[in-house]
Amino acid sequence: MAVGDTLVAGMSGRLVGLNPDNGIVRWEAPLASPRGTNDVERLVELVAPVSRVGSTVCARAFQVAVGCVDASRGAVEWVQKAGGSHGIHGNDDTVFGTESNGAVVAWRRTDGARLWSTDRLQHRKLTAPLVLGRAVVIGDDAGLIHLLSREDGAPLNRLQTDGSGVAATPVAAADTLVVVTGNGNIYGYRPD
């Protein structure tokens, strides 16, 4: 993604700022370091989606951490341990993520402080979150769409699909929430 005159990309657990004219690295901002006893255990990658507000880009390092970088300077603003395998989403104030155990977590965008965490969806295979209005929207492996409050993670609503499991992160298209299931069905939900 472009931030000012810099192309920002993920590379082995780091966000990297590149000069788009010649590909020279301007800065590197580590979100995670390799660890483990073999090459597979030491593999560290960033996963999509990422969350950008202004020049701040927040990303998840697979099963290791979530963090934010000021892409105008290449400076790491914060990094917090997090055990998720899907990307994150956020708004001006908060970054949201799902953990591998089914917990949903909200971090303050400015400093990474944990604002809330809920285990109401524990032991479900969750998608990455989508911030939509006052809700955080998350799909699961039973084909349910969960709408949680952005403020405290309290349940707001639950929508049912065909029961085959949500195949990808829900997306917003104009005024419609779009969900794709494992059976290939596409659902569109609009507020009344």
Annotate each language-model stretch with its function:
Residues 20-23, 70-73, 108-111, 149-153, ...:
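Short loop/turn segments that connect beta-strands within beta-propeller blades
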Residues 94-109, 113-147:
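Loop/turn-rich, solvent-exposed surfaces of beta-rich toroidal or solenoidal domains
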Residues 1-5, 28-53, 77-92, 114-132, ...:
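Extracytoplasmic beta-rich repeat domains
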